[in-house]
């Protein structure tokens, strides 16, 4: 698909004598499913076309969400709608994510793409304006359940026992035993599950408790603090 678009873009360059930018909405949620949505694919495609075609330097891919997700897309859309004075809900009520809508054009809310969309709206505290086969409350609860079930299976595969218990069941590793409790190298700390940046070494201090201690967190860490009494 991208190759066809690129070839057509080259024909526009030749005919109109203009530079062409190809904008695509591929995002990180597509990487595992679609090989042609991965960053390395577009890097390779651009490189190959530039070697094999005249004036291919006048064609570029614009992939603003290649490292983002559907939350990133919706958040960007909300800001853009505010900037140009249009109603976000009206715009998105005219979109559809599902690959299997019913005869009335309603999404089931159960496909992978549906669930990603539903959870993105939830993350931003919004209700999806499109009509689903079932109520919003029901499709939302199903999406939350499926996500938890999928993530639990994934983390059981990927994490060792103590990592799984700490991240999924709120367990605590014994003090002075963890991999990073006495870590002194400069660097950044990321969540082993979701990959979000949580802390940097500049935030770390020696509390003497036997666990890694930080006096603050990254501004995008989204950590929920719970008072321990």
What are these regions (language model features)?
Residues 1-146:
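Nucleotide-activated chemistry modules centered on ATP-dependent adenylation/adenylyltransferase
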Residues 147-229:
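A short Gly-Trp-Pro
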């Amino acid at each position: 698909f991208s190759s066809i678009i690129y070839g057509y873009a080259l024909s526009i360059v030749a005919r109109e004598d203009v530079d062409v930018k190809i904008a695509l909405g591929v995002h990180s949620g597509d990487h595992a499913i679609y090989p042609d949505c991965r960053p390395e694919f577009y890097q390779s495609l651009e490189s190959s076309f530039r070697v094999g075609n005249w004036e291919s330097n006048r064609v570029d891919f614009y992939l603003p969400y290649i490292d983002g997700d559907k939350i990133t897309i919706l958040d960007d859309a909300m800001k853009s709608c505010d900037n140009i004075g249009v109603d976000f809900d009206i715009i998105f009520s005219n979109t559809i994510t599902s690959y299997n809508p019913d005869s009335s054009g309603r999404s089931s809310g159960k496909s992978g793409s549906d669930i990603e969309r539903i959870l993105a709206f939830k993350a931003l505290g919004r209700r999806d304006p499109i009509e689903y086969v079932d109520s919003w409350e029901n499709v939302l609860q199903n999406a939350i359940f499926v996500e938890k079930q999928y993530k639990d299976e994934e983390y059981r595969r990927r994490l060792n026992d103590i990592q799984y218990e700490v991240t999924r069941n709120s367990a605590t590793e014994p003090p002075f035993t963890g991999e990073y409790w006495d870590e002194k190298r400069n660097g950044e700390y990321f969540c082993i599950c979701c990959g979000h940046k949580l802390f940097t070494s500049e935030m770390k201090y020696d509390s003497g408790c036997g666990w890694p201690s930080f006096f603050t967190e990254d501004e995008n860490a989204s950590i929920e603090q719970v008072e321990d009494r």
